[in-house]
Amino acid sequence: MIVVSLTVSPVKNAEGQIVGASKIARDITEQKRSQEQIATLAREAEHRSKNLLATVQATVRLSQSETPDGLKRAIEGRIQSLANVHSLFVQTRWVGADLSTIATQELAPYSEKDRRHVRIDGPPVLLEPDVAQTVAITLHELATNAAKYGALAVPDGEVELKWHDADGRLNLRWTESNGPKVREPAHKGFGGRVIEQMIAQRSGTIHFDWRADGLICEIILKV
């Protein structure tokens, strides 16, 4: 089967009146075939990455006798976060993922019941895969921490995530309010060390302000 692109343009006389039509047919069979091949490869890549992540999750679950339940759930949550953002890459043929979609995806478990508890505000920003994965894991860790000890752990707690990009830098600000009193932990947890390392690898910075009325986390990343 041949795929044809047809363009029709009006033909006008000297007075500007339409007296006919010009039709141009182009054979775009190869172009269409290439697009379908790319789409197939993208779906296959998604399938393989999901299988790999599923295998890792299964391995963690099988280590039940050796791995504490809390650690196991934490690892599974991070793996699921990566799987979610990988699904977004397929939609853009691995160009990247939209920041708003990542944020909505990561915070959905905490905002579905009562959307006033979570506010997301920022312009459209397409993040390349490496940066998108870093942001996804970071938001996952912040949300998990807030659900355990912060604003998302109490009925009236609120979280606001805002961002803007300028001069090749993405600035994110995570603000918790109306939650339980918090203070800076004596020791950094594994999750905190993970996101600090990931952000540093992207030549970015992260700052935690442990206010009594709620955590403020500010992140700067090159995009």
Which residues make up each language-model segment?
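Sensory coupling linkers of modular signal transduction proteins
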Residues: E15, R26-L41, A45
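Short beta-to-alpha transition helix within the HATPase_c
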Residues: R73-Q80, N84, L88, V95-E112, ...
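ATP phosphate-binding glycine-rich loop and adjacent ATP-lid/helix-beta elements
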Residues: K181-D209
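PAS-family sensory domains
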Residues: T7-S9, Q17-D27
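Conserved short strand/loop->alpha-helix "switch" segment adjacent to the catalytic nucleotide/phosphoryl-transfer site
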Residues: E36-A42, S111-G157, A186
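Short acidic helix/loop segment immediately C-terminal to the autophosphorylated histidine
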Residues: V60-K72, R93
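Short beta-strand/loop element within the Bergerat-fold HATPase_c
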Residues: D156-G168
